[in-house]
């Protein structure tokens, strides 16, 4: 049995396979996921699991070089933006429009769907390297 925080085997495999610059999207329950993009659906019901908790666990094993969020996140859901900043304190953030974020989902290695019901509660984590 694994000793680290992340127990989900699908997420563990995804993180282990990431290369420098690969993107993983962690999204709210309503984020549209392109059919060609791998979907890892963790949503159980409204609010479970929450986005920030999901980011916390994924970031515990993933080397994150930068994070992208929608400009609308800070405007409509500042507590999500603030929470992401606390979880990823040494990570640079870039803001893009919500439409650009949705378009970037097509280039992501996977979209992780959470049960989050907060508007614009989505983040793209860009993989870094540990050396």
From Swiss-Prot:
Pfam families: RbsD_FucU. Its EC number is 5.4.99.62. GO terms for biological process: D-ribose catabolic process. Keywords: Carbohydrate metabolism, Cytoplasm, Isomerase. Gene3D superfamilies: RbsD-like domain (3.40.1650.10). GO terms for molecular function: D-ribose pyranase activity; intramolecular lyase activity; monosaccharide binding. The keyword Ribosomal protein does not apply. The active site is at residue 20. The keyword Cytoplasm applies. NCBIfam families: PRK11797.1 (NF008761). HAMAP family: D_rib_pyranase (MF_01661). This is D-ribose pyranase. It comes from Chloroflexus aggregans (strain MD-66 / DSM 9485). The lineage of its organism: Bacteria, Bacillati, Chloroflexota, Chloroflexia, Chloroflexales. The gene is rbsD.
